[in-house]
């Protein structure tokens, strides 16, 4: 049994090493580069591929994998929106993901960043750097006085709800697929418009689908309370970035914490020190005191990386042995 893993980072290698020791019957090849048309031939002779990347898995790459006899593909992440689904179906590829590598990791950072915005931490850091130790005018807000609207109440959304409740915030939620326990608590509102009208903080925990592309746009912002806070630790395409800038300029949005950006693949996880970033929209957001940007690192904890490697590799082994996997993704 042979599995090839692409785009293996240095920080992932210890977890691959652990998995290989636990599964001595599996031969594993680790490739540091992303899966592309140029290196897909490395998969020849392997039974499965374990992959991670934001870059698209194109029809060309998937067809070449299938031509090499590799029909079992395990993603070390949640999202499958960068897969060419028609090719997946046409070639009968088995796909698995890691549906919940660490909900707490993402929920914890979203709340952490919100607290920095509410406590004016970025502004105080600037003042302290200049030895300005005055308080005013940067007075803070308390989370326990606010209503938090959680869009998407899956594993991550529910972890965030628990943390927000711990701070004493009122929490309301919206999800097309409601959680039975949360529904018993009466937490859900019936429409997004209701959530926009009531929430002081809006946090996104939904996947990137056609139906929610730019779900936070000018129309959505217009329905929100003045001075709302926006948290996006899900997918960059959920927010129309230019409309967010306008909402920040008008004061409709008081601040935003973003761990994703719709054109992030050109920027995130790259060392751009001393270089000019020519994305004007990104730089507009990046240079604001009331916008906190992290480079898609909400997931990035030891627990999460361990789970990403072990769950994906276990699923690939299951595919090879049985043709099915616990985390198999079905495409209707």
Swiss-Prot record:
Highest taxon above the source species: Bacteria
Enzyme Commission number(s) of this protein: 1.1.1.28
Coiled-coil portions: none
Catalytic-site annotation from UniProt: 235, 264, 296 (proton donor)
Any one GO MF annotation of this record: NAD binding
Keyword field: NAD, Oxidoreductase
Oxidoreductase listed as a keyword: yes
Entry keyword Transport: no
Pfam families reported for this sequence: 2-Hacid_dh, 2-Hacid_dh_C
UniProt-listed PROSITE patterns: D_2_HYDROXYACID_DH_1 (PS00065), D_2_HYDROXYACID_DH_2 (PS00670), D_2_HYDROXYACID_DH_3 (PS00671)
Annotated positions binding NAD(+): 155-156, 175, 206-207, 212, 233-235, 259
CDD domains, per the entry: LDH
Classification via InterPro entries: D-isomer_2_OHA_DH_cat_dom (IPR006139), D-isomer_DH_CS (IPR029753), D-isomer_DH_CS1 (IPR029752), D-isomer_DH_NAD-bd (IPR006140), NAD(P)-bd_dom_sf (IPR036291)
Reactions this protein catalyses: (R)-lactate + NAD(+) = pyruvate + NADH + H(+)
Record family assignment: Belongs to the D-isomer specific 2-hydroxyacid dehydrogenase family.
PANTHER family on file: 2-HYDROXYACID DEHYDROGENASE HOMOLOG 1-RELATED
The protein, known as: D-lactate dehydrogenase
Organism listed in the record: Lactiplantibacillus plantarum (strain ATCC BAA-793 / NCIMB 8826 / WCFS1) (Lactobacillus plantarum)
High-level lineage: Bacteria, Bacillati, Bacillota, Bacilli, Lactobacillales
Gene: ldhD
């Amino acid at each position: 049994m042979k599995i090839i893993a692409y785009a293996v980072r240095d920080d992932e290698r210890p977890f691959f090493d652990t998995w290989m020791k636990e599964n001595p019957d599996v031969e594993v090849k680790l490739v540091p580069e992303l899966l592309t048309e140029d290196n897909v031939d490395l998969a020849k002779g392997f039974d499965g591929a374990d992959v991670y990347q934001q870059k698209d898995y194109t029809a060309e790459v998937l067809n070449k994998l299938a031509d090499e006899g590799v029909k079992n593909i395990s993603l070390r992440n949640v999202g499958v929106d960068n897969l060419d689904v028609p090719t997946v179906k046409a070639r009968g590829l088995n796909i698995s993901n890691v549906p919940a590598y660490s909900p707490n990791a993402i929920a914890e950072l979203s709340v952490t960043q919100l607290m920095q915005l509410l406590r004016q931490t970025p502004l105080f850091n600037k003042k302290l750097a200049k030895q300005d130790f005055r308080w005013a005018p940067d007075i803070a807000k308390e989370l326990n006085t606010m209503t938090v609207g959680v869009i998407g109440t899956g594993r991550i959304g529910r972890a965030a709800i628990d943390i927000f409740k711990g701070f004493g915030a009122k929490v309301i939620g919206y999800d097309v697929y409601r959680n039975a326990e949360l529904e018993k608590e009466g937490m859900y509102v019936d429409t997004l418009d209701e959530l926009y009208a009531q929430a002081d903080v809006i946090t996104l925990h939904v996947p990137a689908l056609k139906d929610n592309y730019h779900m936070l746009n000018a129309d959505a912002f217009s329905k929100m309370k003045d001075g709302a806070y926006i948290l996006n630790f899900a997918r960059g395409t959920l927010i129309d970035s230019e409309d967010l800038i306008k909402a920040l300029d008008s004061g409709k949005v008081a601040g935003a914490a973003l761990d994703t950006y719709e054109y992030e693949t050109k920027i995130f996880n790259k060392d751009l020190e001393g270089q000019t970033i020519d994305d004007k929209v990104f730089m507009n957001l990046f240079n604001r005191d009331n916008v906190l940007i992290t480079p898609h690192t909400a997931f990035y904890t030891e627990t999460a990386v361990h789970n990403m490697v072990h769950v994906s590799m276990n699923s690939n082994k299951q595919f090879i042995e049985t043709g099915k996997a616990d985390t198999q993704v079905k495409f209707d």
